[in-house]
Amino acid sequence: MLTRKQYELLRFINERLKESGVPPSFDEMKDALDLRSKSGIHRLITALEERGFIRRLPNRARAIEVIKLPELAASGGGRRGFTPSVIEGNLGKVRRGGGGGADEAERPVAVPVMGRIAAGTPIEALQTCSHTISLPPDMLGAGEHYALEVRGDSMVDAGILDGDMALIQRNPTADTGDIVVALIDDEEATLKRFRRRGASIALEPANAAYEVRILPPNRVQIQGRLVGIYRKY
């Protein structure tokens, strides 16, 4: 399965080849995927080549051949329950009862922004609400939610970019494979993919430039699960 960014890049290369017969430059790929550096494109190209979707031709500049496309193009990134560039349900905290009627149902819900979260080197956890963002009611579901501003690029291959607003469902537990807010040693907060490895916890980046952190459970507190990304263009 491809991540969303891998699929977007593969589609962009394929469309450019069909239009002009020449693959896009790395700068064009970077701009098309809204990445900050070409190193992210290099990693995506390598991943696509390793999975057999493209082939780089030796001794030729900008020589990329698309070998195949995913059978289920609509599936995007293959991450269950999370589509990085789209805000999906379970956002905010639903207030039930009270008979507010149609006007109440259409009123935007304010979700608190609790500070910054590192997608890179963990940063000091922030616990105070700096402001709120308003979300439409059709995106709401049960449970309490908050938002954190993403800082860093360690989750770019999961479609999470520096400056995005991560929408978090407050929850002290997580399933293997979930992207979570992890508090380390009661001091540092980071956004990573959660996995259990024997008696330890692995916090995995989605960027080959960063290392997986393996920690004992007593050093890690799960403070919520990622349910969506809010991005301004």
Curated annotation (Swiss-Prot):
Its EC number is 3.4.21.88. GO terms for biological process: DNA repair; DNA replication; negative regulation of DNA-templated transcription; proteolysis; SOS response. The keyword DNA-binding applies. Coiled coil: none annotated. GO terms for molecular function: DNA binding; serine-type endopeptidase activity. The record marks 119-120 as: Cleavage. Homodimer. Belongs to the peptidase S24 family. NCBIfam families: lexA. This is LexA repressor.
